[in-house]
Regions:
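Divalent metal-dependent hydrolysis catalytic cores, especially in the metallo-beta-lactamase
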Residues: 12-13, 26-52, 70-83, 99-112, ...
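Short, acidic/polar
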Residues: 20-27, 85-96
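Short helix-capping segments at alpha-helix termini
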Residues: 63-73, 168-170, 193-194, 289
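His/Asp/Glu-enriched, well-ordered alpha-helical/loop segment
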Residues: 242-309
Length: 327
């Protein structure tokens, strides 16, 4: 790696900004290097389900931005959560309120998915997906299914037939398989049409299941989908650094209070926002593909979403530093 590199300001296509005081604490880390960030809708106590919710959450984020000192503009890209009760009218109203995408959490697979989608093929949901297609909204999917006698490490693979069904049924709907974690998911996205893409996180480029449970329980590495085998991680690194435009950054940065992680039943999520560009630069440098980092972080996601490139750049300097243990 050169002592200094410049990147166009990032597009982080998967961010958990939270609400309230935690929002104000974590938002500055992403805003310092990103021009845009997709705001995930599975917030609590108020989930983002309607156009009214979109307006409320965007205003919350912008108020938090107004309270921090940042030199460059940051745009939150809003989403709604798609549930079995979501209707085409709700889709239309959310789009008019500024939502660029709808996010599906299958029932019970991750944080705050207790009211997640049960039936991907119901007529009501199909009508909602058609409304998203007609409006130009994207469908973002947490691609796991919790089935009887299915290990947590197999949930993503079990979901892939559903992805295939959706891609074939809605060829004009842009679909993003979020935070892919397995070789088979990467292969599936590559084989499907140009309407299907995937995000990759920094932590899935670095961790395996051993880093979660192999050397004692390490709760701050626990997330959904779980990191998998070495072959899966190697595949993710290879495709992220390959220059394939179907794969781009979505950090899934997910902050939790420390006591919510270090407990008998800890929350899932890895908080990477404070170190995201640095970790990605190390990964790309290790495989000799630092020249492709900007495409992964700042080009391919924008192109898939139909957005112009961000203005401005950030600079990374190669030097030793100590990551704070907590913020």
């Amino acid at each position: 790696m050169n002592d200094r590199i410049a990147l166009r300001r990032l597009d982080d296509m998967h961010c958990h900004f939270r609400v309230g005081s935690l929002l104000k604490e974590v938002l500055p880390f992403t805003a310092q290097y990103a021009g845009r960030g997709i705001a995930m809708p599975n917030t609590r106590p108020r989930a983002i389900l309607t156009g009214e919710d979109v307006v409320w959450y965007r205003d919350e984020i912008k108020r938090a931005l107004d309270e921090i000192s940042h030199q460059h503009p940051f745009e939150p890209l809003m989403t709604i959560e798609i549930r079995d009760s979501t209707t085409p009218q709700m889709i239309t109203e959310a789009y008019r309120a500024g939502a660029v995408a709808g996010k599906v959490y299958p029932l019970g697979v991750t944080t705050n998915s207790d009211e997640g989608l049960r039936d991907f093929d119901s007529e009501t949901i199909s009508e909602s997906f058609r409304a998203m297609r007609d409006a130009g909204m994207l469908l973002l999917i947490h691609g796991e299914l919790d089935r009887e006698r299915t290990l947590v490490t197999k949930r993503e693979e079990v979901f892939l037939p559903t992805l295939l069904m959706l891609a074939e049924k809605f060829p004009d709907l842009k679909i993003v398989l979020e935070h892919v974690s397995t070789r088979v998911a990467v292969e599936s996205v590559r084989q499907l049409g140009k309407n299907v893409a995937a995000t990759i996180t920094a932590h899935h480029l670095c961790l395996t299941l051993n880093d979660v449970v192999g050397y004692g329980i390490q709760p701050h590495h626990g997330c959904m989908p779980m990191p998998k085998d070495f072959d899966d991680r190697d595949t993710l690194v290879a495709v992220a650094t390959s220059g394939d435009p179907k794969f781009f950054l979505g950090s899934d940065t997910a902050p939790h209070l420390r006591e919510k992680k270090e407990c008998a039943k800890g929350e899932c999520g890895v908080y990477t926002a404070p170190v995201l560009p640095q970790v990605l630069a190390e990964v790309f440098e290790e495989v000799g593909c630092l020249d492709r980092l900007g495409d992964f972080t700042s080009r391919f996601g924008a192109e898939f979403y139909g957005l112009p490139p961000n203005d401005g750049t950030i600079s990374l300097t190669k030097s030793e530093w100590i990551v704070p243990e907590q913020i």
